[in-house]
Amino acid sequence: MLRKISLLLLPVFVAINLVHSSPEIMKNLSNNFGKAMDQCKDELSLPDSVVADLYNFWKDDYVMTDRLAGCAINCLATKLDVVDPDGNLHHGNAKDFAMKHGADETMAQQLVDIIHGCEKSAPPNDDKCMKTIDVAMCFKKEIHKLNWVPNMDLVIGEVLAEV
């Protein structure tokens, strides 16, 4: 279940395509991002509270605070090779991943730039998981400003269809 809910988080590390509907691309990217979630859930012994955090992430007024949710995002990003060993976005790999899953070059770069800006604006934190929470919340805010939030009904529908 956690793997399925994590599908909602791909946009934290990938981009959008102008040719297609941005929410549709976000949905596609989310579906691909979560493929490593079962491994991360097992490796980190993630509780159900993390599932709730990931499920609620895109709600406009929801604030994710559970450190383990940040750890889950880090695990996924590491498995997909979109972050460097320090936990920072690997610009080239993240852009390539986004383009592989439907984003055009311009939008992939735009999202990489947003994430990079969020990394720079997040307060210093030696805890990688909490730093990821700060970056993710900043990113979510920017995605809401652009009206690129994926349609949750469509995401959940596709997740359930895969079960």
Swiss-Prot record:
Q: Name one Pfam family in it.
A: PBP_GOBP
- Provide the coiled-coil residue spans: none
**Which SMART domains would you find in this protein's record?**
PhBP
Q: Name one GO biological process term.
A: response to pheromone
Instruction: Report the family membership.
Output: Belongs to the PBP/GOBP family.
Q: What protein name is recorded for this chain?
A: Pheromone-binding protein
Which Cys pairs are S-S linked?
A: 40-75, 71-129, 118-138
Give the matching Gene3D superfamilies: Pheromone/general odorant binding protein domain
> Molecular function terms in GO for this entry?
pheromone binding
CDD domains under this entry?
PBP_GOBP (cd23992)
- Which keywords belong to this entry? Disulfide bond, Pheromone response, Pheromone-binding, Signal, Transport
Query: What tissues contain this protein?
Result: Antenna.
Role description: This major soluble protein in olfactory sensilla of male moths might serve to solubilize the extremely hydrophobic pheromone molecules and to transport pheromone through the aqueous lymph to receptors located on olfactory cilia.
Q: Give the source species.
A: Antheraea polyphemus
Tell me the domain of life.
Eukaryota
Q: Where is the signal peptide?
A: 1-21
The record's subunit annotation is: Homodimer.
Please give the InterPro entries that the UniProt record associates with this protein: Odorant/phero-bd_Lep, PBP/GOBP, PBP_GOBP_sf
